[in-house]
Amino acid sequence: MIRFSPWSFAALVIGAALTHAALATGDPNAGKIKFATCTGCHAIPGYTNAYPTYHVPRLGGQHPDYVAAALKDYQAGGRQHPTMHANAFPLGEQDIQDIAAYVASFKPAASPQPIRGDAAAGKIKSATCVACHGSDGKSQIPIYPRLAGQYEDYLRKALTDYQSGARQNPIMKSLTAPLSTQDIADLSAWFASQPGGLVTVQPD
């Protein structure tokens, strides 16, 4: 199992705090209007990507800093997804912060979903994940995503992409490198099965 030293984690947490302090303030009311383009995928419960087939991620209750960073990654091409790149590309800094503030304004409350992997095994295997993502997937560090209640197949896709390098992140690349297909399934099941997690954004 790969582990980081306490100093490594301290550096990550300090970096997260500095990043958080540097971000502009988002307006959730403005973000609600700007999110309109996103509703066709992210506001439909159970909606799936065309190919490969996996659920479009739940965003309600996610950390705004993480959402903003993800949108910037799509803008720059660091995360490869043609539709997301096209939608994120024209956004300005304030647009990104407003959208992030809007999705973060939803209270995490999702019920556990039916799962395919072994959640009990995933809990044991998640020991390396907890420093950033929390023991139950409810990360308290703004730049690291909450995972509780996220779609299981989306989590499997994300971990597989980190492992293959299709999704770029040096830390996640190193942590996923030794994982088997079963490990990925079990970890995904554990985080997806946690109550009080992410929800589908539902504009009123």
Residue ranges and their predicted role:
Residues 19-21:
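N-terminal signal peptide c-region/cleavage motif recognized by signal peptidases
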Residues 1-11:
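Bacterial N-terminal signal peptides that target proteins for export
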